């Protein structure tokens, strides 16, 4: 429901919830996406312990709906001919301006892992790879690098020199 209300498809997971399962109030929560691949990760851990058809079927919809949101959240950057994450995006560090933050390292790496893992789930279920997810995977921005170091975010070239980010 949250994803649909925000103009995306699939399932968007909150950063934190109340004991009843409702999304907890947060000034940054709606802008965070680092937690999105978690359900795919958890399902994959269960699959590694119980690599059978029943496990694949049990978590099929969670994996699919999570990946569906992830693919719909990535936006096409015409200038760079690639998919990007953000803006609006609050990185896991919660220190960068959400209205200018793009391609945070943790999120880009986890996005790639999550979508690829969801594609492998489809294959294990005897399904073809999802074309839209694959387009995002094939054209997702890489990790930003400066002076041989991965930046916190592509939009933060001063990741290691600006004292605000230390």
PLM regions with names:
Residues 3-28, 81-106, 149-165:
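Carbohydrate-binding/catalytic loop surfaces
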Residues 1, 32-41, 45-49, 57, ...:
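Active-site core of glycosidic bond-cleaving carbohydrate-active enzymes
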Residues 1-41, 47-58, 62, 66, ...:
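Helix-terminus loop motifs that line ligand-binding clefts
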């Amino acid at each position: 429901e949250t994803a649909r209300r925000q103009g995306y498809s699939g399932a968007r997971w909150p950063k934190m919830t109340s004991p009843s399962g409702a999304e907890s109030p947060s000034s940054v929560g709606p802008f965070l996406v680092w937690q999105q691949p978690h359900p795919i990760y958890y399902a994959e851990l269960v699959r590694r312990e119980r690599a059978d058809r029943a496990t694949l079927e049990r978590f099929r919809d969670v994996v699919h709906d999570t990946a569906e949101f992830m693919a719909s959240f990535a936006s096409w950057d015409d200038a760079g001919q690639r998919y990007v994450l953000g803006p609006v995006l609050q990185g896991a560090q919660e220190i960068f301006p959400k209205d200018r933050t793009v391609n945070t390292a943790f999120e880009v790496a986890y996005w790639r892992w999550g979508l690829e893992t969801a594609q492998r789930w489809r294959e294990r279920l005897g399904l073809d790879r999802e074309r839209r997810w694959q387009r995002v995977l094939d054209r997702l921005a890489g990790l930003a690098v400066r002076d041989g170091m991965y930046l916190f975010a592509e939009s933060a070239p001063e990741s290691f020199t600006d004292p605000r980010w230390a």
